Amino acid sequence: KRNIIEVNKINFSVRLLPLICYEIIYTGKIFNNRDFDFIVNISEDGWFGQSIGPHQHFVHSIYRGIESGKYVLRSANNGIAAIVNPLGVVEKKVDLNQSGYVDFIESKKITPTIFSKYGNKIFGLMILLYILLIFSFNRIKNE
């Protein structure tokens, strides 16, 4: 379980879920920690070289934002740095092998997603329903 970093100021409080490098590709890192405001992903994508790796790694961070319904703040040395909103829209971005920064001024909160509440249990329920449907159709077919 990853610890949440809490920053408290006089009129401001924020809880960050830090995910280092490839941890962003694992959904379980997020759903073992549900009480956070933003996902912060720090990565060194230089070891991917000129492959498609940095792009795939970045796309995983977009999915984590959508699943959790939270902003992803991504900083990547030699990779793609970006701010991704909870709907998966890349609001600001510094492209691969470019230097720069992005300002994050305001955030929008959305209601928790079904996936952020129940995680992979949804898929277990879908499998169970599918099995029940198979047995139901077989029963109807045999009558």
Please place each PLM-identified region on the residue numbering.
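Solvent-exposed soluble domains appended to multi-pass membrane proteins
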Residues: K1-E143
